[in-house]
């Protein structure tokens, strides 16, 4: 008997779970991936491809375990998004490329966590996470506290959202989520004005840059936002004049 066969026989005899030598996030340990970047950069595509990759990986995992004579089950995988995102379909995450997956829309962190726990979801994919802006009694973003609790419960969480608002400032809970994330994929789009790498969302109202003091949350697609680089990004001030942060820095 070869060494590998001896090891397999030992595992079967000792009844060591298959997960101990091929561990999965969501059942054996917690893992948080926070996908960020600009508008139209591919964040939702990343989330959608992750959804299909996880389902395929689990099919392979279960077949491999069964060949070893060990019974394991695939992880429960489910996608969510904030109900504030009404751009395409309420029950789907749809990327700008047209790719889509089914999802459940929720309007609060409490409803999100309740659904994950009630349905025993091992892998939760959450789009537009920047809209979960409610805070707990401790003053912390509720989505951050929820993520920590879910990670302690060995859940696999993949979140996607804008890292900056239309002013170029950290968007809601994203900065705190990035601080606790185990993986941080970042995506850059192309400036709609000059074609340079774009890291800022430009909000447009009737074709003109938005005011600095406008509400942070305004859900839209191409008609209200476009990706821009730092040189082309503009904001309207109270004096009805446009400001560009890069130009302001050069003047210092």
Briefly describe each language-model feature range:
Residues 190-218:
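Short recognition patches in nucleic-acid-associated and regulatory proteins
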Residues 118-123:
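Short acidic/histidine-rich motifs immediately flanking catalytic phosphotransfer sites
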Residues 48, 52, 144, 148-151:
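A structural alpha-helix within SAM-dependent methyltransferase catalytic domains
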Residues 149-172:
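Sensor-1/coupling segment of RecA-like P-loop NTPase cores
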Residues 181:
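Short basic (Lys/Arg) and small-residue
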Residues 129-147, 166-171:
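Conserved ATPase-coupling elements of RecA-like P-loop NTPase cores
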Residues 2-115, 165-176, 186-189, 210-211, ...:
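Conserved P-loop
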